[in-house]
Amino acid sequence: GVRRCGKSTILKMIMERLKAQHNIPKERIVSCRYDSMEYEDMTAKQMYAQLKERLSPDGKTYLFLDEVQEIKGWEKVVNSLASDFDVDLYVTGSNSRMMSSEISTYLTGRYVSFRIFTLSFGEYLMFKSHYTEVGEPKTELVDYVRLGGFPATHLQEFSQDEVYTIVRDIYNSTIFSDIVKRNQVRKIDQLERVVKYTFNNVGNTFSAKSISDYLKAEHRALDNETVYSYLEKLEK
């Protein structure tokens, strides 16, 4: 799922359920968040060694690995742990490579995947009911479409400007951390023009050529191959 859609919260809920309903001791629950600076230079071998060190000798260990795509080769680590030890693994990630055929090859028959989305309209109403009175459905639907469904924007009553600030921060972290940094994009202004076009044409059919033609008309020409390259990076 996309950044800030609630993946980490879902992991925490599973951990709490294991402790409360299944009496799993906390010593057998291991949680790591790999977008932390603590793991910035970690290799797959180091990841494997660290997790192996934290496995419980007294029964199944439950491993919760958040934003695992930050570690190159993480899928080999997960496969090795699943093969060699008594573990139950839960992993999250923020890009489409989590669903790639390469990963499926490593983990064949050993995983179930879930796509996590932002709040549905029904979930939005449920969130809102915790801190204020819910209005007429049509009015609430307009607000939902305008403000979006990121959980962080509906944890309390925010002004429209505050919501836009939160969403802008999520956008910036997605563009700069997940796309620019990972793909070493140098011409960020070009990428943002392509992003803006796609946002403005949600629900419409478009191609790399139509984007290129539009930007050319705006005197900001980009060739088809460059546009396609940016779209490919955005998709991943």
Question: For each predicted feature, which ranges?
Answer:
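Walker A (P-loop) phosphate-binding loop of P-loop NTPases
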Residues: 3-4
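Structural recognition of the conserved hydrophobic beta-strand(s) that form the central parallel beta-sheet
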Residues: 64, 88-94, 115
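Amphipathic alpha-helical "lid/sensor" segments that cap RecA-like P-loop NTPase cores
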Residues: 131, 135-172, 180-181
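Accessory nucleic acid-recognition modules appended to NTPase machines
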Residues: 160-236
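Short regulatory helix/loop adjacent to the ATP-binding pocket of P-loop NTPases
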Residues: 80, 97-113, 127-129
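Walker A/P-loop
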Residues: 8
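Short glycine-rich substrate-engagement loop in P-loop NTPases that contacts/grips substrate
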Residues: 28-61
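Conserved P-loop NTPase "ATPase switch" module shared by AAA+ and STAND
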Residues: 56-74
